[in-house]
Amino acid sequence: MKRTISTIIFLLIAQQLAFSQEEKLSFTTYYFSDSGSNSVTTNALNLAKRLFSKTMFFLDLELDNVYVPPVDGASGATRPARQKNEPFEKSRGQIILGVEQGIDDVTNIAANFYHSQELDYRSNSVIGSVSREMFEKNTKLMLRGQFTQDEVGKILENGDIETFDKWTVSGKAAIGQILSPTTVLDLSYDLVIHNGYLSDPYRQVKIFDALNAFETVAESHPDTRIRHAISGKISHFLEPVSASISGNYRFYFDDWNVSSHTVETQFNKYVFEDLILRLNYRFYTQGAAEFWQERYSDAVVENGDFRTADYKLQSFNSNNFGLSLTYLLSGIAESRRDLQFLENASIEARYFRYFNTLDFSANIVQMNLNFGF
């Protein structure tokens, strides 16, 4: 779960780094806790600075602290077997460096490098992207490619670390179209190809024999996976009430026979001149991987068949509710000469509640402090 959250955060940041035109400095704090008493605290520093008229520099620094309680049979988190009766804690650090260069008034190219490291996991990525505006800037095309090399580690009983390798190649094509002065349509296609060690070294699968006795063995996934996603989003500004609303749909499928549907909507509203309210809801549903079983027999091991203990590969539905408040500090800057540096600054507080049909739930709290230049 922790790696999933970190991956999502990274992809969101990487996408923002690609083509942002605004100079800013921001500090973000995330807190995640789930129904198994696992928790992740993240602190991030983001900088976007214009070096020349058409050149932007980006820097992202992030530190995660992970806490997993002692194994008691109730937690679904993965962790080393070593000292399993004691809490497990570890840290993860990441850095993203990026440069965006304007070629002309309508074309930008960008390159980013990502490095992440923790005790038993290391990841490096190179990301390249290009965007171009057309038809009087009413249409925007974007292409992005990424290569990632991961070193997956397993902490053994004696404290040594066994490592496995995997790599990922991904690409994205997106188009944004202004339909009217108040409506924008976005369409995109994503392709992701994984190769190498795609299991979790800590997850164990129960194997039952004819007498209903069981033993645990390591899960075994295929060493390749090809994933596709098609998504569309429409955003509309409600001028009479100074608000906006958006809705998007995403269809996903892969060669493990997993398919999913995601529907999401967001409402944004100026409550006061300096206060913005955002409400978000997301529904997700997916089918199971072809090799997922609720109960595995010993024939699976004897035949060398694939097996998994990953709950994310079974059928389930999930719901996510979000609420955020953003307070713009421009009013304070206007009233105080000594605080004019806050003219483009804001404070944002976010809360997300997640739950699914697998009896799992989580709370995420996020605080952002942003300084614009």
Language model segments and positions:
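Outer-membrane beta-barrel channels and translocator barrels
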Residues: S20, F52-K54, D104-V106, F135-K137, ...
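Short glycine/proline- and aromatic-enriched beta-strand/turn motifs that initiate or cap beta-hairpins
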Residues: S20-D60, I364
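Transmembrane beta-strands of outer-membrane beta-barrel proteins
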Residues: E23-F27, F57-L59, I109-A111, T139-L143, ...
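Transmembrane beta-strands of outer-membrane beta-barrel pores
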Residues: T29-S33, L63-Y67, F113-L119, R132-M134, ...
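Extracellular loop and loop/strand-boundary signature of outer-membrane beta-barrel proteins
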Residues: Y30-S33, A81-N85, N112-S116, S129, ...
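Outer-membrane beta-barrel translocator/channel fold
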Residues: D34, N38, F58-G98, K140-L198, ...
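Residues on the lipid-exposed face of transmembrane beta-strands in outer-membrane beta-barrel proteins
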Residues: L45-K49, L97-Q101, G128-R132, A173-Q177, ...
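Outer membrane beta-barrel transmembrane domains
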Residues: T78-P87, D200-K233, F253-N257, H261-E264, ...
